Amino acid sequence: MRLSSSLIALVALAGQALALPFNELAERDTGLDVKLIPIGNTRVKAIITNNADHEMSFVKYNTLFDSSPVRKVQISKDGSIIPFKGIHLYYDIDNLPKEAYKTLAPGASAEAEFDIAETSDLSAGGSFKISAEGSIPVIDGQGTKPTSSIRFKANTLTMDIDGEMASRVASAIPELNKRTRVDNQTCTGQYAQLLQGGLRTCATYAQRAAQAASGGNAQKFQEYFKTTNQQTRQNVARRFQAIAQECSSANQGRTIYFCQDVYGYCQGAIAYTVPDRSHVVNCPAYWSLPPVLNRGLGPDHGYVIVHEFTHAPSVFSPGTVDHAYGYEQCRRLNAQQSLNNADSYSLFAADVSRN
């Protein structure tokens, strides 16, 4: 973790607060249909249709309909996954702004277009497979908060891509000049103090989680990762050890931390990671979280940092994705999904550290 010299010199603030509510959405398999259509060399259209008999509002964030460069699809070539070079957003599903939702009447559809070359290197050209599946939080009828989550699996596309044309598509993530100087500019004053405290909490969480993963209660590990395989437990412990080391490295490390929204993708989010550049960005909502929680599974500053560092392959490879948020949704994942889900690690770390 590389931070500014002014940040290193400051002492962290400490605090206690009650846990925030976490996601307890019921999940179902019907109500929304998602279709993918190729509309250009690297451009794709997504169409979502409300198949229910009532009005429904779906969350756009972290889905195919998010205007931010989040992972919308999975791209593969010759059986190998193409690395994702966009961002991973972390948000509080219970406090989303109105613009996070799109409302659909029964039978109505919504469309979104995006360029897959903005977040993946497709310059090799040739045949690529494009797929999308996951869960979308929804509000059934009138309401202000999601009432359930609907699983979907879109059709798989096979696209013959011109590599030269794809290479000319601009990346969705702009280059930042003098990145360490930007860090000096964003992590100052109270931001610096709070971040230092968050990093210390992160280190504590990760150290305790590493111990619990390698030699702790097997049932507790099973609760979050759906397996008790000893080799898997050791691998999870190694990820936590790497996170603990990164959280303890104030003037060195593999990531760069920004305390303000240098890329402009914070709308509705608490924090986000740019894994391809090893950048972690705190949003304004991050600073409103309690610095430290002593009970429960809600997010505090250290919890969010653990979550974000699991996304960074420079800390531990491969980096994780966001299959689900919160205890109830994460509990529905299978073993493979759980081991690749950022919030599963934060929840496990919080549980073994606080409870």
From Swiss-Prot:
Secreted metalloproteinase that allows assimilation of proteinaceous substrates. Shows high activities on basic nuclear substrates such as histone and protamine. May be involved in virulence. One of its GO terms (biological process) is proteolysis. Its cofactor is Zn(2+). Binds 1 zinc ion per subunit. It comes from the Eukaryota. This is Neutral protease 2 homolog MEP6. PANTHER family: NEUTRAL PROTEASE 2-RELATED, PTHR37016. Disulfide bonds join C187-C259, C266-C283. It catalyses: Preferential cleavage of bonds with hydrophobic residues in P1'. Also 3-Asn-|-Gln-4 and 8-Gly-|-Ser-9 bonds in insulin B chain. One of its GO terms (molecular function) is metalloendopeptidase activity. It is found in: Secreted. It comes from Coccidioides posadasii (strain C735). Belongs to the peptidase M35 family. Residues 1-19 form the signal peptide. Keywords: Cleavage on pair of basic residues, Disulfide bond, Hydrolase, Metal-binding, Metalloprotease, Protease, Secreted, Signal, Virulence, Zinc, Zymogen. Zn(2+) binds at H307, H311, D322.
